A protein has these predicted regions:
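A charged, aromatic-enriched C-terminal amphipathic alpha-helix characteristic of glycosyltransferases
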Residues: 108-137
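Active-site donor-binding acidic/aromatic loop of nucleotide-activated sugar
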Residues: 7-12, 25-33, 40
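Nucleotide-sugar-dependent
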Residues: 52-58, 80-81
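Short alpha-helical segment that forms part of, or immediately flanks, the ligand-binding pocket
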Residues: 38, 61-66, 80-81
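Short hydrophobic beta-strand element within catalytic cores of glycosyltransferases
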Residues: 70-73
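A short hydrophobic beta-strand element within the catalytic core of glycosyltransferases
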Residues: 47-49
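An anion/phosphate-binding loop that grips the pyrophosphate of nucleotide cofactors and donors
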Residues: 44
Length: 137
C-alpha cells in the first residue's frame, strides 16, 4: 500500500514479477495510494514492515496494530521496539528469509493478536511531560 517513487519503479516491477512467477496474485496485492488505509489494515491477514532502513518509529505498524492486524517486521529500529512490546511473534532477524517465511506461517496460523497499543499520543505526551517535570524538580 502506498505510492511508488520514480526511483523505485524497477523494484516494484521486480516484486510484481516475483509475485506473478510464484502464482501469488490472489494472495498479494499492490494497491498504490489509498485513502482508506484503516480499512485495508482491518481486512489484512498480516501487515509486513520490511524496510531495510531502520525507522525511528514505525507509525504504519502502530496504525495496523490499532486496527487489529497482525504485523511481521525486521528486528531493527522502531519496528523492533514496537513488536517486542506489542507482538513479539512478528519479529524476524533482518534479511533472514527462511525465518521470515517460518514466522509468517506461524503468525498466519496462530490465533494470537497484538497486545493493547501502549504507543498512544496521550500516553507518550504524558510520559514526556513527566520526564520534563522530573528534570526541573
Amino acid at each position: 500500500v502506498g505510492p511508488t517513487a520514480k526511483s523505485k519503479k524497477k523494484y516494484l516491477n521486480k516484486l510484481q514479477y516475483k509475485v506473478s512467477s510464484l502464482n501469488l496474485e490472489d494472495k498479494i496485492t499492490f494497491t498504490g495510494s489509498r485513502r482508506d488505509i484503516a480499512n485495508i489494515y482491518k481486512i489484512s491477514d498480516i501487515v509486513f514492515n520490511l524496510s531495510q532502513t531502520p525507522e525511528p518509529f514505525g507509525r504504519t505498524m502502530i496504525e495496523a496494530i490499532a486496527c487489529g492486524a497482525k504485523v511481521v517486521g525486521w528486528n531493527h529500529g522502531g519496528a523492533s521496539e514496537i513488536l517486542s512490546e506489542l507482538f513479539p511473534q512478528g519479529l524476524v532477524t533482518l534479511n533472514h528469509m527462511n525465518e521470515l517465511l517460518k514466522t509468517t506461517n506461524q503468525v498466519a496460523s496462530s490465533n494470537s493478536l497484538p497486545r493493547e497499543n501502549i504507543f498512544t499520543a496521550n500516553r507518550m505526551t504524558n510520559s514526556t511531560i513527566s520526564l520534563y517535570q522530573s528534570l526541573i524538580s
